Every structure is written in structure tokens, then in C-alpha cells.
Amino acid sequence: MTEQQFKYRVVFFQQPGCVACNAMKPIWAETANELAEETPYYKIGFGEWDVTSDNWEFCDQINCDGTPNFAVFNEDCELIGLNTDGILAKTQLKDFITKSIESSNK
């Protein structure tokens, strides 16, 4: 799937050396793979953002105040979901992503 085909984008905000971010990476990868397989109709693109790459500027724009955190954007790059709770269980992360998408479709 090319970038133009994504209807939603989910971003994992992380930073190098963050112990919690490193603990979250396997959960993030597993969740992304499962959602891509289970919900292809959502056309979700998954990516990571190193918050140190722009000195937290992007995070400040969307009120993302720490790591690890997650955001969901629609195809117009509008923020439709922001989770700043840090480490999540896989079911919590999946629920956050799907609820963000479903609530934007109402």
C-alpha cells in the first residue's frame, strides 16, 4: 500500500534511550501487524516519530507531552486521537486506535 492509499495514520512518539519506549516497541509492532491484517478496510499506515528529531516541535503542536505516546490522523492530516497515557497493553492500544477511527466516521 502506498502512502496515498492510507486513510489513517497512527504515529508512535518515541525517543532514543527511553526505557518505556523500548518496552513499548514489541507491543506497538504486534498491534500494528494485527490491525493491518484484521482491519484492512481502515487502510491504516503505521509510523514512528523520534521526538528529538525536531526538538519536540511537532509534539508541542498537538499537545503530546511525553513518550511513549500515540496519535491517530485522518487522510487530511487532522488529529483525531491522542493517547498520552504512556505504556499500554496491546488491547488498550488496539482499542484506542479503533475507537479513534470509528468516532471520526460518525
What do these predicted regions represent?
Residues 60-65:
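A short glycine-leucine-enriched loop at secondary-structure breakpoints
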